[in-house]
Amino acid sequence: MRCCGVCAFDAARGPRRLMRVGLALILVGHVNLLVGAVLHGTVLRHVANPRGAVTPEYTTANVISVGSGLLSVSVGLVALLASRNLLRPRLHWALLTLALVNLLLSAACSMGLLLAVSLTVANGGRRLIADCHPGLMDPSIPLDQGPGHTDCSFDPTRIYDTALALWIPSLFMSAAEAALSGYCCVAALTLRGIGPCRKEGLQEQLQELTELELPECKRQENVQLLHGRQDFQALQKTWV
């Protein structure tokens, strides 16, 4: 039994939706990259310990998030190309492969960010600054007091607030990337006629739409050339 909400790609509105999803993936991917860069520059570079090891929050929130953002931009570009070239199987397979990988990566990123936020909230941010404040794992000691406080080059209370303020938007954007990538997977499978979302006669409908669009494009080009020629003749008369 087909699910109309999932298998929503059709010949009439599917290409336009795929184009919008591609643009959304490019936008969300760039914003996620920006948030990851700000998170690294303002928070996470302070909590790396001198031995080169980093907290689990760093790995989940920065590395995976940045990778998901980069891949989302790539999926968005391929989706834009596929929406304008609906009869090219190579683009369909490329879209399916990249979207499936990005779906898994974005889902893993969302789960990792959710775990990082949960751990950070549960211990009040002490896990983030454990290397700088080795004696502050005791919840009864305030973050701005205790042994090791004078060794830190940053304000530990702001690290907690800033990390959460950047992690939570990144969490929602990663979830959005996963959802948009899922739509791209469904669209690619529908275009190839694979799975429960295949539609009989879809390729023929797309072929007819493509053939109808070509004369329209040529007509618009002819109109533009005619208007340009008329403007040029009017300009010549003005100079004369």
UniProtKB/Swiss-Prot annotation:
Q: What's the protein's topology in the membrane?
A: Multi-pass membrane protein
Gene Ontology CC annotation, any one: membrane
Which Pfam families does its entry note? Answer: BCLP
**Transmembrane parts of this sequence:** 21-41, 63-83, 95-115, 163-183
What keyword terms does UniProt attach to this protein? Membrane, Transmembrane, Transmembrane helix
Tell me yes or no: is Membrane among this UniProt entry's keywords: yes
Q: Which InterPro entries match?
A: Beta-casein-like (IPR020977)
Keyword Cytoplasm present in the record's keywords: the answer is no
The protein's predominant localisation is membrane
What subcellular locations does the record give?
Membrane
Q: Which family does it belong to?
A: Belongs to the TMEM54 family.
Q: What is this protein called?
A: Keratinocyte-associated protein 3
